[in-house]
Structures are given as structure tokens and as C-alpha cells.
Amino acid sequence: MMRSQGQISRIIGQNATAMTDITGFGIIGHLMKICRESGVGVTLSLDQVPILKGALDLTLIGVRSTLFEENVSQSFEVKYPKDNIKWPLLFDPQTSGGLLAAIPEKDVYLVTNELKKYGFMNEIIGEFFAGPPEIRVT
């Protein structure tokens, strides 16, 4: 983490319906928790998920964290393309990852523009849908 998440959480928090930092459960584990607690599903665009420099290279040579297998085994509600070389990164635990937030569609561009104004990297990585708690990775 290069910057404190205090300011970014205040900006996002004004409009978010759910927000968490990505830590030991990886982005998939935290997103699944939001889905379960909210009673919704989500379509996640794997190509929109930011990846740290060097992370994909490590994945390609088979480097995995000690929690990787456990995170994968607990994600039975996740449908992901196993032929995409990036999928293992979704289960990678972090000790201090970025923030993951659910923002109503009407507020998305307001929030993303405000984050850009202050120099915060941000991406729209998916969309929630009414339905059972599941993650569909595309």
C-alpha cells in the first residue's frame, strides 16, 4: 500500500452500500461475503481487476500463497474461467490490499471522478444482479 486508505474510504463511503479492504480471503472471498450478506450475485470482469506488477509473472511459474488452496476450496459459488491465466490472482490473500466497494449505479461515475481528482487509482470491476449469492467471472 502506497497511500493511506483514510481519504479514499471517506470518498467512497459517502455513496457505498458495502465496503471492505481486501485481505486474507482475496478479492473473491471478500466479494462473496458482500454477496452473501446482501443476497445478490455479481458478474466480475477479470480483465478489469487491477494486478500488481510482477504478480502475473509469479502466477505463471506456479507461485501460490499458503492460503491459496483454502481460499479456492471455500469458493464453490464462484464460476470462473480456468483457462484464463489471471484467475489464481482472484484468490490471492493480501495483508493490505485495496478497497472493494459496492456503489449504486447512479453514483458510480460521481465516485470514480472524485477518486481520480485526488489521484486514486480505481476500476469498475463488476456489476451486481438480483439472484442467488454467486460470482460469475468473465
Q: Predicted regions: what is each one?
A:
Residues 1-138:
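Helix-biased detector of long, well-ordered alpha-helical tracts
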